[in-house]
Amino acid sequence: TLDEIKKMTEKIGPLVQLSLTGGEPFLRNEFTEISDLFYKNCKPLYVTIPTNGSLTDRIFDYYKFFLEKYPKINFRCVFSIEGIGAEHDKLRDVKGSFKKIEDSYNKMYSLRKKYKNLVLDSNSVFTANSEDTLLGTLKYLEKNFNFDNISVTYARGNIPDENLKTLAKKKYIEINDYVDSIERNKEGRIFSNIMRGINSITRENVIKVGFEDKFVNPCVAGKKIVVISETGDVFPCEILG
């Protein structure tokens, strides 16, 4: 409940990074009220919210409201994109979903031009279903959109369909080499530069851990990271949730 979230946020203390995720976060009716409690009580420096772009007006109104209310917070809106056009619709099993992303991006870009504390990113998941087409998807996004960052997530953890996981190391490296090459030419907003550094380290660690089964560094889950579910359950990280 909102009252429970209020009490919780009053005890958490200041946050460096806050991620508000789903499912689709903007589907929740109280999402604005929940966000405001975190922003007011935890004073995060950086906020990341992934979205499928399906609720264009709600997404736009949300960011317009909070960009004006909290000018010291750096917001990152991340569009989840798995393919182009019909391919994305098929992978998401929702007809017209890619058009929704285009509509939401175009409307959000007007805010990006006005507010320096907003970055627009895309994220795609590297799986067995996408490994052969993902490079083409990323090249299309780079040519037809103006995202601050284009990132790739490696399928991991408790994924319902284990067949979606893959060990195609060569393709993963090729795709991330491309991502690395285009990042160098992008505008350097503060959140953009931070995310590029994080993405670079993450890519290296995924190759070592996911493909080469190497130990990289001690786990900090539960110490520097915590995950709170929509029901209030607390976990040290996504994997252990």
Language model features with spans:
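Conserved alpha-helical substructure of the radical SAM core
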Residues: 1-75, 161, 170-171
